[in-house]
């Protein structure tokens, strides 16, 4: 069983993948297991891409075989960032222990996570389809740029693939597979417009601030990008 809602929210957020981190924090806040401040804290560092998807699809698509260093950076940085926030901006978060009678058992937690995941996957699919249909916009933009002589020398195919990644990162990863992996790896913590819209809808329901969430994500993106630069230059 989980001794506190904070432990449960952290584990689900890290292992079940986006958007389960934000959704779990919202659900626990709605059920009054945590405060609004504690929900904001959990969303700041747990709402990440799932490790199974990261290892089984993202890294192989980018041609990366030595997965351990990338896995350590992708999830180690948010975890350390969460610990840092816990000692600084979110010191007031108590995460009271759950009474014995209300503690969440592992089986019940798994069952609840599966139910939430089914609803999340349906919503995720809707955003995925919607934003992938907008892939035509980067293509039209690049074609428009191609009519201007001064931008002919720009890497237009790369720019188009990168813009697609910004729109919807799941489909954009495949389009970026021919380019250095650093560009995609740098976008993963933020997740592109699709992830931001989903997170925004959840945060709005909880009365949480999307700009605050994005600020935390941008800080982690910068840190992860810096560590990936070191790893890639080290030959991993």
Go through each PLM region and give its residues.
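Alpha-helical membrane segments and immediately flanking helix-loop junctions
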Residues: 2-62, 163-177, 182-206
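Alpha-helical transmembrane segments of multi-pass membrane proteins
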Residues: 8, 115, 119, 123, ...
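Alpha-helical transmembrane segments in multi-pass membrane proteins
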Residues: 13, 17, 73-81, 127, ...
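Membrane-core helix-loop-helix motifs of multi-pass transport proteins
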Residues: 33-87, 202-226
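Short, amphipathic, aromatic/basic-enriched membrane-interface segments that mark the entry/exit
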Residues: 37-45, 99-103, 158
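Selected transmembrane alpha-helices and immediately adjacent juxtamembrane segments
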Residues: 68-150, 226
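Transmembrane helical segments that form the transport core of multi-pass membrane transport proteins
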Residues: 114-188, 192
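Juxtamembrane boundary at the C-terminal end of a transmembrane helix
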Residues: 227-236
């Amino acid at each position: 069983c989980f001794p506190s809602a904070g432990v449960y929210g952290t584990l689900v957020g890290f292992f079940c993948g986006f958007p389960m981190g934000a959704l779990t924090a919202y659900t626990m806040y709605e059920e009054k297991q945590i405060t609004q401040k504690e929900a904001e804290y959990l969303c700041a560092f747990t709402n990440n891409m799932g490790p199974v998807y990261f290892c089984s699809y993202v890294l192989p698509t980018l041609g990366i075989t030595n997965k351990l260093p990338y896995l350590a950076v992708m999830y180690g940085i948010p975890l350390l960032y969460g610990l840092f926030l816990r000692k600084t901006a979110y010191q007031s978060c108590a995460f009271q222990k759950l009474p014995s009678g209300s503690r969440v058992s592992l089986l019940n937690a798994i069952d609840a996570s599966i139910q939430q995941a089914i609803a999340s996957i349906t919503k995720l699919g809707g955003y995925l389809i919607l934003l992938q249909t907008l892939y035509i916009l980067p293509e039209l933009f690049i074609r428009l740029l191609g009519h201007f002589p001064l931008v002919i020398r720009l890497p237009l195919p790369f720019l188009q693939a990168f813009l697609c990644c910004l729109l919807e990162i799941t489909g954009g990863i495949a389009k970026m597979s021919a380019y250095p992996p650093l560009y995609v790896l740098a976008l993963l913590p933020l997740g592109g417009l699709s992830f931001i819209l989903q997170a925004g809808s959840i945060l709005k329901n909880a009365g949480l601030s999307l700009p605050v969430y994005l600020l935390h994500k941008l800080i982690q993106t910068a840190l992860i990008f810096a560590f990936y630069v070191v790893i890639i230059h080290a030959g991993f």
